[in-house]
Swiss-Prot record:
It comes from Agaricus bisporus (White button mushroom). Residues 60-87 are annotated as: Linker. Belongs to the glycosyl hydrolase 6 (cellulase B) family. Its EC number is 3.2.1.91. This is Exoglucanase 3.
C-alpha cells in the first residue's frame, strides 16, 4: 500500500522520470505529464481529470474511457480513486454549486461596514464563492426546504454539513452542541437526521453533498483518553451510521470528516483511522452514496505546501495532499471508498501558527484556493470551502461556558465572539490576506 503512495510522490517530484510503462495505479497522462503514456499489461489509461490520467485494472476501467497508447485520453467522468466505487460518482462533475443566501447576506453586510473602498469591493466578491451550509442545530433544519427549492429552480448542487451529535466536540469546548447523552441526546439526534432526510426527500431532482459530523470520528481515533469522548464513543458511531443510512436512502452524496494532516495524518494514526472508517462503512451496509472523506474542514492546512511548515516537524504528511495519498491506499485496502474533498477556504497563508494543533481564529489567515474540480489528483473530487469564512471558531471570553483556551492563544485573533457568530475583524483579515488575491 505504501509503494503506491511513494510512486505517486516520486512521479510528482521528478517530472522527467521515464519508464517503459506505468504500473497499475500509476500515472499515464495529464497536463504537463512527461512520463510514460502506456500502461502495464492488464490495465488501461483512464483520464481522471485534466491533470491526471491513471492506469486502472481492465476490470475497473469503463469501456468508454479506453485510450490508445501514446494519445491524450478523452474527457470522461469516472469515479476516481481506489477501492469500492460509490454509486454517485464525483457529484461535482458538470454541476454549478448553489450559493447560500444566508452567507451572502452576512458578506454583503460585512462589506458595507468596511470603509476602505478597495477592501470592501474584494469583500463583496466573497458572496459569489460557494460554501457549505451548517446545520448545527435542529432549529435550522426547516430552512433546508427553501434552500433546496431555490437550488432546484437554478439546477444547482447544494452543500450541507450535518453537525449535531450528542456531546458534540467532545475533546474541546468551543462548539459544544445542543444535545447531551444524559438527556436522550441520541434519539434527539436521530430525529434531527430524520427531519433533514424528510426535507431532501421532497426534492429528489436536487443534488446534495453532505459532510458528516466534523471532528467526531477523528476524536475516537486519538482522544478516547478524554472521558467525554470515551463516554460518547458508541453514540458517535451509532449516530454517524444512522445519518449515513438515512441520507443514503434519499440520494445524498456523503463525505465523512477525517480531521486533517496534523491530526489523523500522523503515521501512527493512519491505520486506526482507516480501520474505523471502514468499520462504519460496513456497519452502515456499504451505502452506495457514501463517496469518501472530507479533510481540513474549518482548518488552515495547505493542500500542497511549497515547503513544510516548521510546526509539522516529524510528520512526513505535512500538508493535505501528503495526508490524502498516505490514507487513500489504507482506506482502499480496508474496503472504504477512497475519494476526497478538501477544505481550502482559509488556507491562503501558511507558517502562521505556533503549534499545528492551533485551530481557533488563527491570526493572519487568508482566504485560500477557490472551489474547483481541477484538483490535480484523481483522489480528490473537489476543493471546497466547507467553513464559511468570517463565522467565528470560538470565543476568547474566558467567562463563557463555551470558552476554549485555544481561542485565547497568542496566535488566535482576539477579541472573538461565540463560535458560529459573525467575526467582522477576522473576515476583513481573511479578505486582505486572500491568496490568490480576491
Amino acid at each position: 500500500m505504501f509503494k503506491f503512495a511513494a510512486l505517486l510522490a516520486l512521479a510528482s517530484l521528478v517530472p522527467g522520470f521515464v519508464q517503459a510503462q506505468s504500473p497499475v495505479w500509476g500515472q499515464c497522462g495529464g497536463n504537463g505529464w512527461t512520463g510514460p503514456t502506456t500502461c502495464a499489461s492488464g490495465s488501461t489509461c483512464v483520464k481522471q481529470n485534466d491533470f491526471y490520467s491513471q492506469c486502472l485494472p481492465n476490470n475497473q476501467a469503463p469501456p468508454s474511457t479506453t485510450t490508445q497508447p501514446g494519445t491524450t485520453p478523452p474527457a470522461t467522468t469516472t469515479s476516481g480513486g481506489t477501492g469500492p466505487t460509490s454509486g454517485a460518482g464525483n457529484p461535482y462533475t458538470g454541476k454549478t454549486v448553489w450559493l447560500s443566501p444566508f452567507y451572502a447576506d452576512e458578506v454583503a453586510q460585512a462589506a458595507a461596514d468596511i470603509s476602505n473602498p478597495s477592501l470592501a469591493t474584494k469583500a463583496a466578491s466573497v458572496a459569489k464563492i460557494p460554501t457549505f451550509v451548517w446545520f448545527d442545530t435542529v432549529a435550522k433544519v426547516p430552512d433546508l426546504g427553501g434552500y433546496l427549492a431555490d437550488a432546484r429552480s437554478k439546477n444547482q448542487l447544494v452543500q450541507i454539513v450535518v453537525y449535531d451529535l450528542p456531546d458534540r466536540d467532545c475533546a474541546a469546548l468551543a462548539s459544544n452542541g445542543e444535545f447531551s447523552l444524559a438527556n436522550d441526546g441520541l434519539n434527539k439526534y436521530k430525529n434531527y437526521v430524520d427531519q433533514i432526510a424528510a426535507q431532501i426527500k421532497q426534492f429528489p431532482d436536487v443534488s446534495v453533498v453532505a459532510v458528516i459530523e466534523p471532528d467526531s470520528l477523528a476524536n475516537l481515533v486519538t482522544n478516547l483518553n478524554v472521558q467525554k469522548c470515551a463516554n460518547a464513543q458508541s453514540a458517535y458511531k451509532e449516530g454517524v451510521i444512522y445519518a449515513v443510512q438515512k441520507l443514503n436512502a434519499v440520494g445524498v452524496t456523503m463525505y465523512i470528516d477525517a480531521g486533517h494532516a496534523g491530526w489523523l495524518g500522523w503515521p501512527a494514526n493512519l491505520s486506526p483511522a482507516a480501520q474505523l472508517f471502514a468499520q462504519i462503512y460496513r456497519d452502515a451496509g456499504s451505502p452506495r452514496n457514501l463517496r469518501g472523506i472530507a479533510t481540513n474542514v474549518a482548518n488552515f492546512n495547505a493542500l500542497r505546501a511549497s515547503s513544510p511548515d516548521p510546526i509539522t516537524q516529524g510528520n512526513s504528511n505535512y500538508d493535505e495532499i501528503h495526508y490524502i495519498e498516505a490514507l487513500a491506499p489504507m482506506l482502499s485496502n480496508a474496503g472504504f471508498p477512497a475519494h476526497f474533498i478538501v477544505d481550502q477556504g482559509r488556507s491562503g497563508v501558511q507558517n502562521i501558527r505556533d503549534q499545528w494543533g492551533d485551530w481557533c481564529n488563527v491570526k493572519g489567515a487568508g482566504f485560500g484556493q477557490r472551489p474547483t474540480t481541477n484538483t490535480g489528483s484523481s483522489l480528490i473530487d473537489a476543493i471546497v470551502w466547507v467553513k464559511p469564512g468570517g463565522e467565528c471558531d470560538g470565543t476568547s471570553d474566558n467567562s463563557s461556558p463555551r470558552f476554549d483556551s485555544h481561542c485565547s492563544l497568542s496566535d488566535a485573533h482576539q477579541p472573538a465572539p461565540e463560535a458560529g457568530t459573525w467575526f467582522q475583524a477576522y473576515f476583513e483579515t481573511l479578505v486582505a490576506n486572500a491568496n490568490p488575491a480576491l
